[in-house]
């Protein structure tokens, strides 16, 4: 949870108000609830040479990418790209979707996602602008995509 909070406070602060950042980073979750929320078909953790966690991501079996966070100290090192690629390799889906922050939208465009629409998310009564983005499977053909889905 520390990496999540630190990333929100240091990276997302340029695109959201101080109040939004405080609510987002301070959103109370029990440690048990946090761990349980990663019980999706694919949850990945990136570590550095010292085995320190520098990023994490998870995706549901329908291709919904729920979370992608990379340590503020490891932004622009390819960690996020490798996590997304690994998720997409492990989850065979005709399309991938994610609700992404204002800050993350340019990154997702670089890995092939397109903006579907602007969205409003809420934590309690605090509103956050984000975007629903999607990407079609880059399977070579429909029969291969169908084979991957079975």
Regions found by a protein language model. Give the residues of each.
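Helix-adjacent hinge/juxtasegments
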Residues: 55-62, 66-71, 77
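Conserved beta-hairpin
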Residues: 39-55, 60
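Conserved active-site tyrosine of GNAT-family acetyltransferases
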Residues: 108, 113
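Alpha-helix C-terminal capping segments
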Residues: 37-38, 57-60, 83-92
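Conserved GNAT-fold acetyl-CoA-binding loop/helix
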Residues: 1, 5-32
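Conserved catalytic-core motifs of GNAT/GCN5-like acyltransferases
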Residues: 95-99, 114-132
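Terminal substrate-recognition subdomain of acyl/acetyltransferases
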Residues: 103, 126-150
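Conserved acetyl-CoA-binding loop-helix of GNAT-fold acetyltransferases
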Residues: 70-72, 76-90, 100
């Amino acid at each position: 949870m520390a990496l999540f909070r630190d990333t929100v406070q240091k990276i997302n602060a340029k695109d959201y108000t101080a109040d939004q950042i405080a609510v987002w980073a301070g959103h109370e979750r029990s440690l048990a609830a946090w761990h349980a929320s990663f019980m999706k078909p694919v949850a990945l953790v990136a570590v550095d040479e010292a085995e320190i966690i520098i990023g994490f991501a998870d995706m549901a079996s329908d291709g919904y990418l729920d979370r992608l966070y990379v340590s503020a100290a490891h932004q622009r090192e390819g960690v996020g790209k490798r996590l997304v690629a690994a998720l997409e390799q492990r989850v065979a889906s005709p399309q991938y979707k994610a609700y992404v922050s204002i800050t993350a939208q340019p990154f997702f465009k670089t890995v092939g996602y397109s903006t579907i629409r602007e969205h409003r998310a809420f934590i309690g009564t605090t509103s956050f602008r984000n975007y629903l983005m999607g990407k079609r499977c880059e399977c070579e053909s429909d029969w291969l995509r169908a084979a991957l889905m079975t």
